[in-house]
Regions:
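N-terminal secretory signal peptides and thylakoid transit peptides that target proteins
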Residues: 1-17
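Metal-dependent C-N hydrolase catalytic cores
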Residues: 24-169, 176
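Conserved alpha-helical scaffold segments that buttress catalytic/binding sites
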Residues: 41, 126, 130, 141-300, ...
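Short glycine-rich phosphate-binding loop at a beta-alpha junction
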Residues: 69-70, 261-266, 307
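A short helix->loop->beta-strand "cap" motif at the edges of active sites that frequently abuts
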Residues: 301-305
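A charged, well-structured terminal subsegment
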Residues: 329-333
Length: 333
């Protein structure tokens, strides 16, 4: 099924990157425009607009005043089709309600602004990957909302509509990246990313996540067609020491052997001890410590190239603490 002409026009094209071509910014912060209609699933939703407001407050802190900033453009149709089926994209567009909300599944709700918000999230991921791969920024953090790592090529799930990390990785591979590592520290396993790249030897997907927990994937035995999937499940109640050990003992050795040209982080903060959607016991300092180690790896092995994409984290108070801990480590602030 082909997209209608109107849908293609709505999807638009990526805007030019507003960075100085002759410089390499230390840190790029990418946020959706203030005037974009919000993705608002309604009262009681976990992924509510207050999450993005908390991230905006966190990134307005004085330590980030020198960071380069850009607004998310809408993702191009070409970028979306690198991961998602055209029939699925059209189905999402057609399902967009003009008012109130539309429930597509038990954990997927669309409001009037959802489709545009999802386009901006995916477009921000592509913009950041482009900036980092083209040498205009060393690292980038994108306030991607709605999140993306559960989204399948033809199905929305787990609050996710477009798979932002997968779209960014495909874009990087289309440039001059030979190998891309997608590293996921969300409390929930990124089943969408894993499925998309199960048979892709140029992409390593590695994840720590709580098990058992939604979506039910992410066992150690799930290793991909080329051994390019590394899962390190955590148990309910695990804290910073177990989290750090899983990265040190399982993921970093695989990362060293893979030798990526770019790191894409699925930065989920729902492992924080106060988050009710999981049962891990992490603190802001645990996310900072991991980010510092990832930054050091990137400096030594891939010219510092990191693109970090917001995934989970459902208490605005926790996001306001964890996001600056993570982004500050990216920027060495």
């Amino acid at each position: 099924m082909r997209l209608t002409r109107r849908a293609a026009l709505i999807l638009g094209a990526l805007a030019p990157l507003p960075l100085r071509a002759e410089t390499r910014e230390k840190l790029l912060l990418v946020l959706p425009p203030e005037d974009v209609a919000p993705h608002d699933p309604g009262p009681g939703a976990y992924d509510r607009p207050e999450r993005l407001a908390a991230v905006r407050r966190a990134l307005a802190r004085s330590e980030f005043v020198t960071a380069a900033r850009a607004e998310t453009p809408k993702a191009s149709l070409h970028a979306l089709l690198a991961v998602h089926d055209s029939t699925y994209i059209e189905r999402l567009r057609a399902a967009s309600p003009s008012e109130s909300v539309m429930r597509l599944g038990p954990d997927v709700v669309m409001s009037r602004g959802t489709f545009d918000a999802a386009l901006h999230a995916a477009g921000g991921a592509v913009l950041a990957a482009d900036a980092v791969m083209q040498g205009r920024a060393r690292s980038a953090f994108v306030a991607t909302r709605p999140p993306g790592h559960h989204a399948l090529p033809d199905e929305a799930m787990g609050f996710c509509f477009f798979n932002n990390a997968a779209i960014a990785a495909r874009h990087a591979l289309a440039l001059d990246a030979e190998r891309v590592a997608i590293l996921d520290f969300d409390a929930h396993h990124g089943n969408g990313v894993q499925r998309i790249f199960w048979s892709e030897k140029r992409v390593l997907y590695a994840s720590t996540h709580q098990m058992p927990l939604f979506p039910g994937t992410g066992a150690i035995s799930e290793q991909g067609e080329h051994g390019n999937i590394v899962n390190a499940p955590l148990a309910k109640g695990d804290g910073g020491e177990v989290f750090a050990a899983a990265w040190r003992e399982r993921i970093f050795p695989a990362l060293e052997a893979f030798a990526p040209d770019l790191l894409i982080l699925c930065a989920g903060f729902d492992g924080h001890r106060h988050d009710s959607l999981a049962g891990l016991r992490l603190e802001g300092q645990d996310f900072r410590a991991l980010t510092l180690r990832l930054r050091d790896f990137a400096e030594k092995r891939c010219n510092g190239r990191i693109v970090s994409l917001l995934e989970g984290g459902y208490r605005p108070e926790d996001l306001e603490a964890c996001v600056p801990a993570h982004v500050g480590a990216l920027a060495d602030a």
